[in-house]
Amino acid sequence: MSALEHEVASQPQMWRTAAAMGAEAREALPAAGARIAVVGCGTSWFMAQSVAALREAGGLGETDAFTPTEMPPGRRYDAVVVISRSGTTTEIVRALRAVPPGTPTVAISAVPHSPVVEAAGSSILLESADEQSVVQTRFATTALALFRASFGEDLRPAIADAERALTEPLPFDPVAFEHFVFLGRGWTIGLANEAALKLREACQAWTEAYPAMEYRHGPISVAEPHSVVWSLGEAAPELLEQVAQTGATVVAGELDPMAELVRVHRVAGLLAEAKGLDPDRPRHLTRSVVLQS
């Protein structure tokens, strides 16, 4: 079993841990009403997108999501939250050092005493969610689960759906397809972006991701019988009907969107195995991006 497979299978338990930390996280994270930025690279950026959309939709305050290199210089926030599994990503450390003095900063990481944790004013550690695989799965979803719990959400339905995602048959045979498109709305746009990245990293697949209602504004032109178009969360039935007319296989996600992402993780592992690839060590990638100063 690859490390990826083990880490994917552990997600329901990791989410239970996150749910139990909800009250603690609520105290550590910026208070409701604060104007904040959530910052990450790669997978962590996509989780930041989901966090920002959830926080705003819940009326908890204006929330922006950025990669560290794209934060608008001079823009003021009441607090900045960063997400970094390894705590070693150079751009995140630099972004924290560039935050105006007096602005609270919080790091979400799996590694204590890491450069990111040391650079932040405070931290929330998810050490049990750390991973051996270069490809992130459980750390990302556990961090998002932590935020959802801190916003007051009951995660028990999502955890039950994750158990289903791990045990029920996949909705299609992954090796029969060459092209994968993921659609999201609201907070699931970040998950769609992450789903597409997962298949690119783990199995070198041709993937795309879009806000659901934008898909027919051009991208649908390349959908065909070897395509899977997968909606993470609710999508308009008429859109899915239009996609089906292209000959593509349509998957209308019925589980909690985070649990749908767990199913995507399974697809990534199966496709990597079918292609003879090591999903734990994708080509050209390392656990984190550490730049020379």
Q: Residues of each region from the PLM?
A:
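Anionic-ligand anchoring segments at beta-strand to alpha-helix junctions in alpha/beta enzyme folds, i.e.
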Residues: 21, 33-79, 177-224, 266-269, ...
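Phosphate-moiety recognition in structured ligand-binding domains
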Residues: 120, 234-235, 242-293
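A general structural motif
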Residues: 161-170, 207-217, 233-234
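A short, well-structured juxtamembrane/interface segment
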Residues: 17-32, 163-176
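Glycine-rich phosphate-binding loops that contact phosphosugars or nucleotide phosphates
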Residues: 34-160, 166, 185, 228-253
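N-terminal amphipathic/basic leader segments beginning at the initiator methionine
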Residues: 1-15
